[in-house]
Structure formats: structure tokens, C-alpha cells
Amino acid sequence: MSLTFLHILIISATVFAVIGSGFYVSRSVRSSAGYSVAGRSAGASLVAGSIAGTVVGGGATVGTAQLAYSFGLSAWWFTLGSGIAFILMGIFYAKRLHNTALETIPQYLELYYGKKAETLSSIISSIGILLSAVASSLPGIEIISALFGLTPFLSALLLMALVIAYTFFGGMKSAAVSGILKMVIIWISLFISGAIAFLLLQENNTLSSFPASHFDLMGQGTDSAMAHLFSVIVGVLCTQTYIQCIFSADTPLKAASGCFIAALIVIPIGLPSVAVGMYMHAAEPETLPILVLPTFLVNHVPVLIAGL
């Protein structure tokens, strides 16, 4: 797997566009509330963009393809579970949380359980966000190392710089606008890639070579599937990153609508990665599982789409 100059050019332009959009929006941020909760003026689209842009990272794309390479359709549980969590958030959480006019989960818990609960929840929430960030970053580090020949340490530094640039200048508002642009790019590139993978699977008549478990959401066992679903739902509902998006909404209705729109965006986005993972398992079984998606993009997808 090697990148052409055009690949690198398109990748650079895409990164610049996503980060640049956030930097442009940051000029309108004038207060701490504007930074942390977008001035509580976000519409449903911005709420959805910030939520979806946060959850759809390396785990939802590269990680899903990696699992699909080994297990098939059951790799869909991450994005499917995230979407279900957003629906639950919109139904049960959005209105109640938004009406408190707070900014964090610990602040909300302090209202009912006191200062000790706030302190403890702050520590637990920070650890949870750290673990989530690590899980999302590992695929990115591996891909940067493979594509550009950098050491894991340098790849981690580069990824860290990009993540900081993504939100540093404008906070929640930058994350929301960048998230919308990021979702457009990912939807276009992934669904075209998924369609190509599915057509290749049909052309080569390889679908029949997979065991039945690869076409079953419960292919890894019902207990395992439910454990995946439960862990994703709990992780989403308890994570400050997603709750903060609700606090940034203009009205409770827009907060709930943003959650539902995010669910519509996130739920189907795992399917193209599943198709890619299954094709690569059949056609290029020597590929490292974590490099399944980038390898497919470079080798089988037009440069313009692959670069995105």
C-alpha cells in the first residue's frame, strides 16, 4: 500500500478544509459559554454535527472494517449501538438536561447529590473520555505510521496536533461545524467505497464462501452482541462529550432533534465498512486487519474518493 502524490494532495486539502472551517467559525466565539456550549444557540444540525462528528472516528470506520474482516456483520454493533443510544438520549435526556442550563454532567449530579458526587463524577468522566480517546486514536496512529512511514511516537504527536487544531480555537461551535463537514466527507467516501466492495463481492461470487455467522448480527453470540450494545449505550449516555452537545442547543426540541438526526447519520455508516472488511477477508487475506480499510481505499477506490 503506497500513496501517490495526488492521494497526499487530496488528504492534505481535506484535513485543511475540516480544520479551516472550525477556525473560521471560531471568530464568532466571544465568551466562555460560547466556547464550551456554543453560546447555547446551536440548531439541530449543529447539535447533530457535533454528536456524529465525535462518535464517528477511527473506531467507527477503521475499527468496524477490522472487526468485519474477522466476524462479518456483527461488526456493525458499534455504530448501531451508538445510534440507539442517541435515540434514547433524544427521548429521555435532551429536554431535562437542556432545561438545567448547565454545562457538564458533574454539575448536574451536584444539584441532586452534592459536591462529593460532582468531584467523583468528574474523575470518572475524565477517565472515560481518556479511554474513549485512546480507542479512537489507536487506528489513526497505525494508519499514519503505515501510510507515511513514521514511528508510532511521531504518528501519535501528529494525530494529537490535528485533534487539538480540530476544536482548540472555537470549542463546541468549531467541533459542530467541522463535524458536519466531516460527516459529508465520510458519507461520500465510505458509501462509494462500500458500494464498490459489495459489487466486487458479487462479481467474484465470494459471498457464498462466508459462513452463515458472517451475515448474522449475533454472529459472535447473543451474549457478546448484547454486551457490545449495552457497553456502547452506557458509554454514550455517560460521556460528557455527547451531553455537552445537548447543553449547546438553542431549545429542548432542537437538542432532541439533533440527537435523532445524529442517529440517522451514524447507524448506517458502519455498513460500508462491514462490506469493505468482508471483501478484504476474501480477496486479500494477507492484509493486516487494522489496515483493511485504508488498503482497500488506496487499491480499489478512485483517487479522489480515497483521498477524502
Place the predicted regions along the sequence by residue.
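Helix-loop-helix module between adjacent transmembrane segments
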Residues: G53, W76-G170, S231-V232
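Extracellular loop-to-transmembrane helix junctions
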Residues: S2-S26, A38, A42, Q66-L102, ...
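Residue-level recognition of pore/gate-forming positions within transmembrane alpha-helices
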Residues: V15-V18, T54-V55, S82-F86, S126-I129, ...
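Membrane-interface "cap" regions at the ends of multi-pass membrane proteins
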Residues: M1-T61, T167-G171, M183, S189, ...
